[in-house]
Amino acid sequence: MCSRGDANAAGAAAARRVTGLCYNMGLLIALALLCLFSLAEANSKAITTSLTTKWFSAPLLLEASEFLAEDSQEKFWSFVEASQNIGSSDQHDTDRSYYDAILEAAFRFLSPLQQNLLKFCLSLRSYSASIQAFQQIAVDEPPPEGCKSFLSVHGKQTCDLGTLESLLLTAPDRPKPLLFKGDHRYPSSNPESPVVIFYSEIGHEEFSNIHHQLISKSNEGKINYVFRHYISNPRKEPVHLSGYGVELAIKSTEYKAKDDTQVKGTEVNTTVIGENDPIDEVQGFLFGKLRELYPSLEGQLKEFRKHLVESTNEMAPLKVWQLQDLSFQTAARILAAPVELALVVMKDISQNFPTKARAITKTAVSAQLRAEVEENQKYFKGTIGLQPGDSALFINGLHIDLDTQDIFSLFDTLRNEARVMEGLHRLGIEGLSLHNILKLNIQPSETDYAVDIRSPAISWVNNLEVDSRYNSWPSSLQELLRPTFPGVIRQIRKNLHNMVFIVDPVHETTAELVSIAEMFLSNHIPLRIGFIFVVNDSEDVDGMQDAGVAVLRAYNYVGQEVDGYHAFQTLTQIYNKVRTGEKVKVEHVVSVLEKKYPYVEVNSILGIDSAYDQNRKEARGYYEQTGVGPLPVVLFNGMPFEKEQLDPDELETITMHKILETTTFFQRAVYLGELSHDQDVVEYIMNQPNVVPRINSRILTAKREYLDLTASNNFYVDDFARFSALDSRGKTAAIANSMNYLTKKGMSSKEIYDDSFIRPVTFWIVGDFDSPSGRQLLYDAIKHQKTSNNVRISMINNPSREISDSSTPVSRAIWAALQTQTSNSAKNFITKMVKEETAEALAAGVDIGEFSVGGMDVSLFKEVFESSRMDFILSHALYCRDVLKLKKGQRVVISNGRIIGPLEDSELFNQDDFHLLENIILKTSGQKIKSHIQQLRVEEDVASDLVMKVDALLSAQPKGEARIEYQFFEDKHSAIKLKPKEGETYYDVVAVVDPVTREAQRLAPLLLVLAQLINMSLRVFMNCQSKLSDMPLKSFYRYVLEPEISFTADNSFAKGPIAKFLDMPQSPLFTLNLNTPESWMVESVRTPYDLDNIYLEEVDSIVAAEYELEYLLLEGHCYDITTGQPPRGLQFTLGTSANPTTVDTIVMANLGYFQLKANPGAWILRLRKGRSDDIYRIYSHDGTDSPPDANDVVVILNNFKSKIIKVKVQKKADMANEDLLSDGTNENESGFWDSFKWGFSGQKTEEVKQDKDDIINIFSVASGHLYERFLRIMMLSVLKNTKTPVKFWFLKNYLSPTFKEFIPYMAKKYNFQYELVQYKWPRWLHQQTEKQRIIWGYKILFLDVLFPLVVDKFLFVDADQIVRTDLKELRDFNLDGAPYGYTPFCDSRREMDGYRFWKSGYWASHLAGRKYHISALYVVDLKKFRKIAAGDRLRGQYQGLSQDPNSLSNLDQDLPNNMIHQVPIKSLPQEWLWCETWCDDASKKRAKTIDLCNNPMTKEPKLEAAVRIVPEWQDYDQEIKQLQTLFQEEKELGTLHEEETQEGSQKHEEL
């Protein structure tokens, strides 16, 4: 017989990496197996984790349709047609055939890369939230009884098509429904017609019938057809989620915290653990390979593997010298593996590090590896700011933040990148050129454009360089470089800061603006101030009748007779006479003039024949020419301020800010020698690149729409039948194919070849050239093009009348000229054609030949002009309607694919606008793309086309962070490198990682999935740390993510992805944590085991932990627009139209942050009724889904990504001096908190009408079965000793399913109320990673937002405490104005002095004689706590201290003690908390509560201590156990009352 030692020896001898299997392999295995058969059989233990949604799963067909809709609505509708009847169950005998049918239908519209992304997306179930959102919106309608599908017409529902007509007749009387971004709108020919929303399930016959009838009604222009998914009878199974991590951390067993209660295991479906699990290498044996080679030895191989696993999983601690090089040794081990397995090895080592570490300590590290890593680290630090040990991931140069980015946002990045890369690929750009072009930064710069202020139209009030009042100021620009205190405004005799007020004198805001200008002047602010008065500019206007003209002439009179400064004083005097809110009148002007200049005839100044009329016409001309937008306008160095910045208080602040900001700009210019002393400063400012002749908001707006120009085909507009059959992208390609361009110098490849004539700017002018406005637009474009060699122009006709020969002469003449003439002749001829006199002559019957120009082939021109083919105009008109979505005759300018318009009928778009447009394109994208295209060496016309198409593609990308340029040094010895497949587009993926960090645990599995999904060039650089002094990873980890849906052997869908921890060591104590995306709130729902204390030696086979996604968070930031500060204590509610207040929250002062718990659907955000709604109103909102002017703020949650909104609020006019928190107690109106407090036995507290002062609120936290057992005993001790009614508040985040199920039953038996509260740790607050420290954080960091405002005071009682007195006494204890009271640590047990850390060092000096308090029991006055912003102060201090891992070792206790000077603590009398560790035995008899503190000297387990120290503890324990037995019996008999178990499925709880 072999001993276990022999077997180990055999295993060790076999432990060599087996890659090539040598001939005696069979012999080796036979020997090893022979030994192993005698070993005792022991079952392998495992832990599994799954996560599902609360809502039911929708058919995958619907999710696939949403994937396509994200690409385009056109693809969505095509897919809907292609997938008819897929949903009918009789079509498919298995899940796999159903899945394959979906893919087959979808693949028609997708490239190979997108096909993979679709499979991944279906595996992630990322669109299940979108379908559920539609489902919730449908339920809100609500659906008519017994209908599988239904229609909603302006709020009226029906499922009978017959009644549709009558509903349509009355529809205009009802308001149109609010449509959302995710709605599927069928292309409509008449946007004004009624909206019909069809709720149905695609893929079914019933859907198809109604759908086709609605399409024909839409095509006839009778309806606007909108489709929303709706499943009348969903399958009753949840969605299995992935994209999260599961951590199994090893717990310290210094203090035993395990419950000794026996747990019955549940039946677990063991098939969850597959035979061919990928973790397949044990001690060098590749078992997957061995099973393939020796199928007959399956059983023996299984035994052999198990033995090897058990021998490896011993976890003896390592010596400090063994730890030092673990990071480098792990890197060496990974890099030694064959390149295709390196990621597998990295995943295996990082995710199972505690059991792998010992073997790794034997790995040798080569000098080259070490040197290369250290060399690269200098570079990482210098260019991307990474320290040794840090991690980073870049995809095509985009930084993917592993801490904040979840898999769903990463998926979006992959998809966006695929669009661009495939677009470039379709345009024939490949390989390295593709990546170089992709990395061009062509995002529109955030430049503030400025207009030229060197205009005679401006009347300057002062001039800093000339006026005597500034004589004492220094005039040298070198003064700018002299150091001053921060924020000091330098007074220099130069016109560095110029402010121009463009005003209409009779506008009511003008008086305020004049007084601000006056304030700047009188305070000697270094500003040159000027005015432009925009008034009536008709020839003969009488200033005695027109107040605006009167102000202008009076100003000019004084300016001319005296000077600008006195003219301005006169202006202020005029406006001083005007009462607030009134307008200036002629008599105001007359009275000031008569008083100041009594000797002058006022009529001669103001009247029709006034000699003081300068600038009147120029002023309006300047205003219209610069296009600066509606009056009033204030320019700072030519840059217009935003409208909201013109508020008087705001304007003052923002101007000071601008002065300081531009000072920095000038300092730099002087320092670099760009601005010298003798230069004219204003000239210098006006020569900056951001100065343009005209500001056109249409051109400068951030919202931009682009054509997709990436398709290619061989169709043209002169074949209308073919053209009309193309899809949008195909039509655009045909339009581009058919274009002939006008260019300067008439150079095109037909005549002369010169590669410098790639023209980076292409304008397509869209309009009706047989109408004056269309001709004018084209004329201005041609005029501009004559001045620029960068531009080419072509036309698209959008006729406003029925198409016929007589209605289109100019359009046909332009087309014929472009088809038949040289570029130069065509240009000259077309310029003639768009003049008004030509159109008039043609209309009068003059022959078109009369207008021919020199060098023109007239007969060829006439032949084309007179042919009867109108295809090109028909195609153009169809294109305008279907793709550009224009009405007949509307004008648009398309510049490099960007659609500007439609322009209003009277809107000016002139030569200056074309100039501005060209400037912007050249600066942001045109030149950069042109220089890359030049390197491709394609001919000129093709090159200009390419610039246009590439620009449209790149510019259409959502604005994100700039791509990072990285040129890493060495990758010979320290990087994993995977090459992409040749000839296909590939992603450039770079990762930097230390293989023994938490980031590596997530990154390795992620990269493995990406490798199966996408073609990529991958480089993973090792970023190791040296000289480790601690074990770098103390946890096992699994990342749940699969590239495609998996199936069982019988072709059914597998039960969804799960995390599997197989072959785990049995001796350690584990705690299980989920690592989910930031906006998910998950809870443990089904497991009898204690997930906080998993001890595998006591488990039968499998610990199966089931979690549920309880809520998706809606997060936001809120500011008061008046103060710019967060409105602390403001409350929001979130609900639906049927149930307006489902949840409620409070705004924090930190960043104005708030969070609300929701689920997929459409939600309405409101201010909470009561003080919030009385004092404030919502002013504006951003990131929401309703139009800015809508009454309700609607927010749609329809995906798994974070949703963060911004809300600005404003105090109501009569509430300006009210304070939200001054009287928070009045919030007890029948608002939300009352509407669903779950009282005992699940009742709402309204029925238990209790005066709130007569209730004691007790808060506690617990995690793990032992502490929940203590918690129940603590509650019992409170109830036995307290006569006043009690309400318990528990932190829900970490409670076990067992506790949540039992608590309603206990509440009913002992007649108390309880509530579960929860809050998600905000993403911006420094995160803790250890579960115990997270729970400590919840004890102190969120007290102001965890409870409703109606709770004034609460007591915190630790779970392991026993109460021996009535807690009413503590509740009523006078805190002397402090926000909270804590008990100080006892000093009486002298033998513990060595452990009292607060008596020396940092704590002794910080406390300065004050006591150090224990956090096991405290009382909080929430009104005071909120009033002094204690929560915000505590979070602020925590944020600073927690960055240092060595501070706040007892977070919940150290933080309030550290803040004792800012947030005072009232010390409670010592008897309120007795604990044996610190207090002597004599004081025990006075104890009001006993706490089972840990004893650092004896390390006695909690349970033993409880029994020994507290005599009544065992009685309480027995009493609860009997109640639990009773509960179990009733549960098994099914006699539990419904409401007693309701908590488990409760729909909403408060924060």
From Swiss-Prot:
Keyword Acetylation: no
Chief localisation class: endoplasmic reticulum
Segments of this protein annotated with the region Glucosyltransferase: 1244-1551
Keyword annotations from UniProtKB, A to Z: Endoplasmic reticulum, Glycoprotein, Glycosyltransferase, Phosphoprotein, Signal, Transferase
Listed GO CC annotations: endoplasmic reticulum; endoplasmic reticulum lumen; endoplasmic reticulum-Golgi intermediate compartment; protein-containing complex
GO function terms (MF aspect): UDP-glucose:glycoprotein glucosyltransferase activity; unfolded protein binding
Glycosylated position list: N269, N536, N1015, N1228
Positions of modified residues (Phosphoserine): S1277
Result of altering Q1453A: Less than 2% activity retained
SUPFAM superfamilies xrefs: Nucleotide-diphospho-sugar transferases
EC number: 2.4.1.-
Pfam families linked to this entry: Glyco_transf_24, Thioredoxin_12, Thioredoxin_13, Thioredoxin_14, Thioredoxin_15, UDP-g_GGTase
Family statement: Belongs to the glycosyltransferase 8 family.
Record note on quaternary structure: Monomer as well as in a tight complex with SELENOF. Interacts with METTL23. Part of a large chaperone multiprotein complex comprising DNAJB11, HSP90B1, HSPA5, HYOU, PDIA2, PDIA4, PDIA6, PPIB, SDF2L1, UGGT1 and very small amounts of ERP29, but not, or at very low levels, CALR nor CANX.
Alphabetical list of PANTHER family matching this protein: UDP-GLUCOSE GLYCOPROTEIN:GLUCOSYLTRANSFERASE, UDP-GLUCOSE:GLYCOPROTEIN GLUCOSYLTRANSFERASE 1
UniProt name for this protein: UDP-glucose:glycoprotein glucosyltransferase 1
Species this chain originates from: Rattus norvegicus
Classification lineage: Eukaryota, Metazoa, Chordata, Craniata, Vertebrata
